[in-house]
From Swiss-Prot:
GO biological process, any: tRNA wobble guanine modification
Organism expressing this protein natively: Caulobacter vibrioides (strain ATCC 19089 / CIP 103742 / CB 15)
Similarity remark: Belongs to the queuine tRNA-ribosyltransferase family.
Pathway stated in the Swiss-Prot or TrEMBL entry: tRNA modification; tRNA-queuosine biosynthesis
Enzyme Commission number: 2.4.2.29
Protein name: Queuine tRNA-ribosyltransferase
Organism ancestry: Bacteria, Pseudomonadati, Pseudomonadota, Alphaproteobacteria, Caulobacterales
Keywords (A to Z) from UniProt: Glycosyltransferase, Queuosine biosynthesis, Transferase, tRNA processing
Length: 371
């Protein structure tokens, strides 16, 4: 039995709703995890994040190992204490950021060697070191294996090479992690847009055995349609009785369509990144508050929301804050967007539990995409 029980409470088609039970609290699924890159969800306090309904946040191994350093976080009591968040934390392995942000000098069977984007210093990240940073130094609740996220588009031979390396690193990650009572390890399915590779990746991961399974290598430029085509089959290759986590996704419509295909967990920087640039996500789609048409719009973003940022401030005021380059604008829109993503996952959980998810899916798409 896995350290964190996962109870699926209802299904509707392929969509599932349930609870992942952890020592630091329950994670209701489908779940959206706000991204706390450098030990903070940008522009938000932990109390604001909690008030939106978030059960879990994501921490970033790459950023934290470089600044302030994982060893320092450990000396300061671990990531939960350091950032004053007492609910579950999932940490990524650092692999994606190494591939996308840093100057990679070498990728070998043993490790990835890279230069810090902060100060140019050289670092070596192995599967074992990633586990040490996440589990032993940061002290996260859900730990991710180190993998290679192959850039898109990829030829099948290149995608296979990355998938096979990730599978070997999965075994090394599991060996380093061992068995723990208060932490779990997720494996990561790879294979780009090739069904045969994703099937093989999943078989190798299942053979090793993980507490949960992620779908990696999507939301890297392939677009919504191509992502959905992969998700038509990829979740089905993974165990039904464990959580399935789609990494780095995404837009609200991506979440709804992925849940329809059997995904349980998501993370993305989109809500806070959009919020810092004046974009609000709403049931009626995204709106750009810098647009002149909101200059005298006295309506709030969402009068029915429990979130003060959504309910209590006019679009005209929010637009003014961005035009005046006031920091409060970024705070309020980040807050609103995280609250909206949490409201969306809560609405999906209710729709699945009540057996009306397909109707919810159709209605959401019609309203959010404007028909």
């Amino acid at each position: 039995m896995a350290a964190f029980p996962f109870e699926i409470e209802a299904t509707d088609g392929k969509a599932r709703t349930g609870v992942l039970k952890t020592p630091r609290g329950d994670i209701r699924t489908p779940a959206f995890m706000p991204v706390g890159t450098a030990a903070t969800v940008k522009a938000m306090t932990v109390d604001q994040v909690k008030d939106t309904g978030a059960d879990i946040i994501l921490g970033n191994t790459y950023h934290l190992m470089l600044r302030p350093s994982a060893e320092r976080v450990k000396r300061l009591g671990g990531l939960h204490k350091f950032m004053r968040w007492d609910k579950p934390i999932l940490t990524d392995s650092g692999g994606f950021q190494v591939m996308s942000l840093s100057g990679i000098s070498k990728l070998t069977e043993e490790a990835v060697t890279f230069s810090s984007h902060v100060d140019g210093s050289k670092h070596v990240l192995t599967p074992e070191r990633s586990i040490e940073i996440q589990a032993d130094l940061l002290g996260s609740d859900i730990v991710m294996q180190l993998d290679e996220c192959v850039a898109w588009p990829a030829e099948e031979a290149r995608a296979r090479k990355g998938m096979e390396l990730s599978a070997r690193w999965a075994k090394r990650s599991k060996d380093a992690f061992g068995t723990r009572d208060t932490q779990v390890l997720f494996g990561i399915q790879q294979g780009s847009t090739f069904e045969n590779l994703r099937r093989e990746s999943s078989e190798r991961l299942r053979e090793i055995g993980f507490d949960g399974y992620a779908i990696g290598g999507l939301a890297v430029g392939e677009g919504h349609q191509a992502m959905c085509e992969v998700l038509d089959y990829a979740p089905g290759f993974l165990p039904e009785d464990r959580p399935r986590y789609l990494m780095g996704v995404g837009k609200p419509i991506d979440l709804v369509e992925a849940v329809a295909r059997g995904v349980d967990m998501f993370d993305c920087v989109l809500p806070t990144r959009s919020g810092r640039h004046g974009q609000a996500w709403t049931w009626d789609g995204p709106i750009n508050l810098k647009n002149a048409k909101y200059a005298e719009d006295e309506t709030p973003l969402d009068p029915d929301s429990d979130c003060p940022a959504s309910r209590d401030y006019s679009k005209a005021y929010l637009r003014h804050l961005f035009k005046a380059e006031e920091i409060l604008g970024q705070v309020l829109l980040s807050w609103h967007n995280i609250a909206f993503f949490q409201a969306l996952t809560a609405a999906m959980r209710a729709a699945i539990a009540e057996g009306r998810f397909e109707q919810f899916r159709r209605d959401f798409a019609a309203r959010h995409l404007g028909g």
